[in-house]
Curated annotation (Swiss-Prot):
Organism ancestry: Bacteria, Pseudomonadati, Pseudomonadota, Alphaproteobacteria, Rhodobacterales
Similarity comment text for this entry: Belongs to the ChlB/BchB/BchZ family.
The protein's Enzyme Commission number: 1.3.7.15
Keywords tagged on the record: Bacteriochlorophyll biosynthesis, Chlorophyll biosynthesis, Oxidoreductase, Photosynthesis
Pathway linked to the protein: Porphyrin-containing compound metabolism; bacteriochlorophyll biosynthesis
Pfam families: Oxidored_nitro, PCP_red
Protein name from the UniProt record: Chlorophyllide reductase subunit Z
Reactions catalysed, as given in the entry: 3-deacetyl-3-vinylbacteriochlorophyllide a + 2 oxidized [2Fe-2S]-[ferredoxin] + ADP + phosphate = chlorophyllide a + 2 reduced [2Fe-2S]-[ferredoxin] + ATP + H2O + H(+); bacteriochlorophyllide a + 2 oxidized [2Fe-2S]-[ferredoxin] + ADP + phosphate = 3-acetyl-3-devinylchlorophyllide a + 2 reduced [2Fe-2S]-[ferredoxin] + ATP + H2O + H(+); 3-deacetyl-3-(1-hydroxyethyl)bacteriochlorophyllide a + 2 oxidized [2Fe-2S]-[ferredoxin] + ADP + phosphate = 3-devinyl-3-(1-hydroxyethyl)chlorophyllide a + 2 reduced [2Fe-2S]-[ferredoxin] + ATP + H2O + H(+)
Species the sequence originates in: Cereibacter sphaeroides (strain ATCC 17023 / DSM 158 / JCM 6121 / CCUG 31486 / LMG 2827 / NBRC 12203 / NCIMB 8253 / ATH 2.4.1.) (Rhodobacter sphaeroides)
Length: 491
């Protein structure tokens, strides 16, 4: 491909999204005019539904003169727009980094953070930014703040680390993790960075345990805080193990809550498992391309807990680039009945629509892409997430079945069935074998309709060419690019 498909932003984006989520902190972006338009004004509208100018951000607006004279003067001008009584942090873009920008002028309360956007990705910088916020505004000269003793009889306290802007489905997952914590009898001490105030950073040490919501970032701060920490769970079994371990750390009994959840939040899981869709679970394969948090968790739940066959699972990991061309090939080879991913995978899936048979269903599970999830009813984590995810998979299976039905408008516009097709039209053995291989790539649920459509198309192509029999080359031409490639191992 001539243009590389990106699946994450640079370090500058991650730092900005972390800093802007904290109350009481102003952000100066040291970059050219308009450098905030894409990450802040534009993208956050399509991911977090934030209106323009919602966040306390100002830009230095670098021009040609700053290339040789430095950025201190432009930074002083930008700082005067902000509230001088509030702390501010300057975040350097790639251009400012290349010319040695980000130097804070005298007489201002601006502190400097270097995102290293040239060599760090969004999640690496976000992880450092979270740790930096605590070390600069929670510690005193590098010393940990004193921990406030929990009053006798008070509930154990838990921090939730990771929620910030630009994270897929953050609101729903945060709501569910908070519900689980409170459900077993604990209370949330702080959510950081989203919604936390700069003046409260020292209170992070008051928690008895920490929950890191994402594998991509947040663990660095959890290590600094020095308290036991757990990864937020996805799936029924993982959530149960998570609650029991959290209860053990906090000295609480989670079993009454787990028992109540089985008869309430998790009831739809058992109902869906025993309903008519159970016939599809063993044959309806799925593929997922998402952050490591979602890719690992969702695959473990659907494949491990429920037994759905996984065609492939590709995790986007911090610090390493995803081979999107390989992902494209996996989608083409396996044609999963349900595909979860970002706009990249949605485009790759759309490229297959010229093929035969029903179209796979797509479920948004990752950025990049326009997907606003401000409502709290679409979790993937926790018990509620297990229910919602299985519900969406079942709906996706129904949608795949819908595509089998012929539309009246399509039937009217389609060419009439050729009367010259012969049911006894001879096929070469290797042509039949090629057809079988193509059909095997379709999910079991849709193989019958795909086989019929492919057979009719092959015989029509042979008749149109004046052939007396269907040969292998005719079938391969129907398959298009990628025919004959061996299926790769699941990632």
């Amino acid at each position: 491909m001539l243009v590389q498909d990106h699946d994450r932003a640079g370090g500058y984006w991650g730092a900005v999204y972390a800093f802007c989520a904290v109350k009481g902190l102003q952000v100066v972006i040291d970059g050219p005019v308009g450098c905030e338009n894409l990450p802040v004004t534009s993208v956050l509208h399509y991911t977090d539904a934030l209106p323009p100018h919602e966040l306390p951000i100002v830009v230095t607006g670098l021009g040609e003169s700053e290339m040789s004279e430095g950025t201190e003067a432009s930074m002083s001008r930008a700082w005067k727009v902000l509230d001088p009584a509030l702390p501010a942090v300057v975040v350097t873009g790639s251009i400012a980094e290349m010319i040695g920008g980000g130097v804070t002028p005298q007489g201002t309360n601006i502190q400097r953070f270097l995102p290293r956007t040239i060599d760090e990705d969004q999640w690496e910088a976000a992880d450092r930014a979270m740790t930096w916020i605590f070390s600069e505004f929670g510690m005193t000269k590098g010393r940990m703040p004193p921990e406030a003793k929990r009053p006798e009889g008070a509930k154990p306290r838990v921090n939730i680390l990771g929620p910030m802007y630009g994270v897929f489905n953050m609101a729903s997952d945060l709501h569910e993790i908070r519900r689980l914590v409170e459900g077993i009898g604990a209370e949330v001490n702080m959510v950081m960075p989203l919604g936390a105030h700069l003046a409260e950073m020292r209170h992070l040490v008051n928690a008895d345990a920490n929950i890191v919501m994402y594998r991509e970032f947040g663990r660095g701060l959890a290590e600094v805080l020095g308290k036991p920490y757990l990864q937020a769970p996805i799936g029924v079994e993982s959530t149960t193990a998570f609650l029991r371990r959290l209860g053990e750390i906090l000295g609480l009994d989670p079993e009454p809550f787990i028992e109540r959840e089985k008869h309430s939040t998790l009831k739809p899981v058992w109902d869906l498992w025993r309903s008519v869709t159970q016939d599809f679970f063993g044959t309806a394969n799925f593929g997922i391309v998402a952050t490591e948090t979602y890719a690992r968790g969702i695959r473990n739940y659907l494949e491990g807990d429920l037994g759905l066959p996984c065609a492939f699972a590709v995790a986007r990991k911090r610090g390493s680039k995803t081979d999107n061309e390989a992902v494209r090939g996996l989608i083409r080879q396996h044609r999963p009945l349900v595909l979860m991913g970002s706009i990249n995978e949605k485009i790759y899936l759309a490229e297959l629509k010229a093929g035969h048979g029903p179209q796979p269903s797509f479920i948004a599970a990752s950025f990049p892409g326009a997907a606003i999830r401000r409502a709290t009813g679409t979790p993937v984590m926790g018990y509620a997430g297990a229910t919602w995810l299985l519900q969406e998979v079942c709906n996706a299976l129904f949608d795949a079945l819908f595509h089998i039905l012929p539309l009246g408008t399509e039937m009217d516009s389609a060419a009439a069935t050729p009367t010259t097709l012969r049911r006894d039209f001879p096929w070469d053995a290797d042509a039949q074998a090629a057809l079988d291989r193509i059909v095997e790539e379709h999910p079991v649920l849709t193989r019958i309709s795909a086989a019929r459509a492919l057979r009719d198309a092959a015989e029509k192509a042979a008749l149109d060419a004046g052939a007396e029999r269907v040969v292998r080359e005719t079938v391969e031409a129907l398959r298009g690019p990628g025919f004959g490639e061996r299926k790769g191992e699941n990632q």
